[in-house]
Amino acid sequence: MARTTPIARYRNIGISAHIDAGKTTTTERILFYTGVNHKIGEVHDGAATMDWMEQEQERGITITSAATTAFWSGMAKQYEPHRINIIDTPGHVDFTIEVERSMRVLDGAVMVYCAVGGVQPQSETVWRQANKYKVPRIAFVNKMDRMGANFLKVVGQIKTRLGANPVPLQLAIGAEEGFTGVVDLVKMKAINWNDADQGVTFEYEDIPADMQDLADEWHQNLIESAAEASEELMEKYLGGEELTEEEIKQALRQRVLNNEIILVTCGSAFKNKGVQAMLDAVIDYLPSPVDVPAINGILDDGKDTPAERHASDDEPFSALAFKIATDPFVGNLTFFRVYSGVVNSGDTVLNSVKTARERFGRIVQMHANKREEIKEVRAGDIAAAIGLKDVTTGDTLCDPENPIILERMEFPEPVISIAVEPKTKADQEKMGLALGRLAKEDPSFRVWTDEESNQTIIAGMGELHLDIIVDRMKREFNVEANVGKPQVAYREAIRAKVTDIEGKHAKQSGGRGQYGHVVIDMYPLEPGSNPKGYEFINDIKGGVIPGEYIPAVDKGIQEQLKSGPLAGYPVVDLGVRLHFGSYHDVDSSELAFKLAASIAFKEGFKKAKPVLLEPIMKVEVETPEENTGDVIGDLSRRRGMLKGQESEVTGVKIHAEVPLSEMFGYATQLRSLTKGRASYTMEFLKYDDAPNNVAQAVIEARGK
């Protein structure tokens, strides 16, 4: 089967935004204008097509990033049909993992900002993730029809808060109730969309006289940004020659692809204005799979030899599984992005991370939660496979003859955990299956059994994250659960270096004895300097401990890290240097050295100024001005560090850093302090030393 759309006409894009910036409505309009969706779904009445899980419709927030395919030939039908694969990404802090995961497989992104709220804390998180994966992006300033809408203010915030270089492609004509259309700064024409057909048709008109000066000024800014793309254009521009529309677009495209500028468009998705021109900008300025660098990976040859795959049908098949979802009718859906080659339904592929073969039974392309079965997928495609047995997020699927492991994704450690138990004993097994399924879908969610209490513990990125997991167990698996009080994921660390700590395990009880003896130094590592949070250096000279016992020493210490001596929490940022010891020809064994190492570790840890670390959250509260004092007072009582505040149209925005343990039940308290008028966002920032009194209380509560 030949390719229907050339790969240069593909756009794999994500649409990402802060909660309530109007991203779902924007996506809905895209689906409407691209002709997929004939009745526009509104989030306000829970009918949006992309939000396909029930809780999303109830809460009006987008949780699962669904992948949808649409076609676009331009507002004025000026292009050949382009295939746009849209990954919808959530805007709520607790679902940052979904954003990270979709950023990994995108080629470009549209950042949606609210014209009133501007750049919000979650926008900064998403921005950092897009930077990490070097995703070229454009911005869409939405909700221009709302009270307090201000396009150029948001452009300023993109510069100051995100450190980006925003270049407006348009200006808004009017604002709030008076918002009627946009000025196209490339063509220097006003665009007015037709309300009668929900903005499907439009007219180019002259720029309103009272906006001509402003339009000239920003047109100049656009031309200068384009001219900076190359020396030839700069010479042409400085020589007073006009740049053609084609030259301007090509130059801006080049700079967007190089991540040098962010082109900014605006509109009101709700009022059917602006999304159409933003789609044109996606085609004009965002990359196709062939415009982005080849994907890097390593060969599965035991040597981790670097390799790459180019976006071409002629290269061996390689794809990355970026999301697992459970579908009530067909079971497991594995969403994957094809980076190279072609695969047909019925083909056998290799999961190179797990070295297991998988058969592609059925392949479907998703339109939100409707699916269309297809026979093959090619480089650049995003699709879902039904019935893969053992594939997890981040696994590589590839041609068995040409194995490669594509870059793995990194997932954050959970910061909050709660105990769960089924309401009826009979549901115990069902609950285990449900939690296993959900953990497979979401790598930032963990499940384990507490060895001491035998309780099932679930852990995630925040209270809302865990609420939704419990909710999904009830809806999708029919398991009702009781949940315990949230527990904070503390950590333990040391603050001083200790040297020559001895650990000796010697036993003689008739017959063969046990003998292991080690001498170690322990030292703190700079937080975040080592991804594992642990390093082991073997400095044994002259064979005082034979080489075969060294891994046992390392293992003995690593086993102790899982449950630290202070309060049984994991130990992080620790370095160990093994430099002396002794052994016995007959009595020494791996077990004896493992035990000797654990004795030395416990001894050294006590002497190395041990501390308890607590998770600190970055909290931003938006409150009416008259409640500012109360809100700040309350944050201080919660051991919050005030980091600053600024005035907004809607009130005051307060920035603080607060320990997670003090934030439980904050939503309720904030509601009563401000009569429900304030809102807040919270995301994990860092681990920091807990004050003595807090640490003492935690240690006593753990019975250590």
From Swiss-Prot:
Gene3D superfamilies for this protein: 3.30.230.10, 3.30.70.240, Elongation Factor G (Translational Gtpase), domain 3 (3.30.70.870), P-loop containing nucleotide triphosphate hydrolases (3.40.50.300), Translation factors (2.40.30.10)
One Pfam family, short name: GTP_EFTU_D2
Chief site of localization: cytoplasm
CDD domains attached to this UniProt entry: EF-G, EFG_III, EFG_mtEFG1_IV, EFG_mtEFG_C, EFG_mtEFG_II
Subcellular location(s) per record: Cytoplasm
UniProt-listed GO biological process terms: ribosome disassembly
SMART domains: EFG_C (SM00838), EFG_IV (SM00889)
Parts of the chain that traverse the membrane: none
SUPFAM superfamilies xref list: EF-G C-terminal domain-like, P-loop containing nucleoside triphosphate hydrolases, Ribosomal protein S5 domain 2-like, Translation proteins
Domain tr-type G: from-to ranges: 8-290
Gene Ontology cellular component list: cytoplasm
Binding site for GTP: 17-24, 88-92, 142-145
Listed GO MF terms: GTP binding; GTPase activity; guanosine tetraphosphate binding; translation elongation factor activity
Key words of the record: Cytoplasm, Elongation factor, GTP-binding, Nucleotide-binding, Protein biosynthesis
The family this protein is said to belong to: Belongs to the TRAFAC class translation factor GTPase superfamily. Classic translation factor GTPase family. EF-G/EF-2 subfamily.
Role this protein plays: Catalyzes the GTP-dependent ribosomal translocation step during translation elongation. During this step, the ribosome changes from the pre-translocational (PRE) to the post-translocational (POST) state as the newly formed A-site-bound peptidyl-tRNA and P-site-bound deacylated tRNA move to the P and E sites, respectively. Catalyzes the coordinated movement of the two tRNA molecules, the mRNA and conformational changes in the ribosome.
Protein name per the record: Elongation factor G
Source taxonomy: Bacteria, Pseudomonadati, Pseudomonadota, Gammaproteobacteria, Enterobacterales
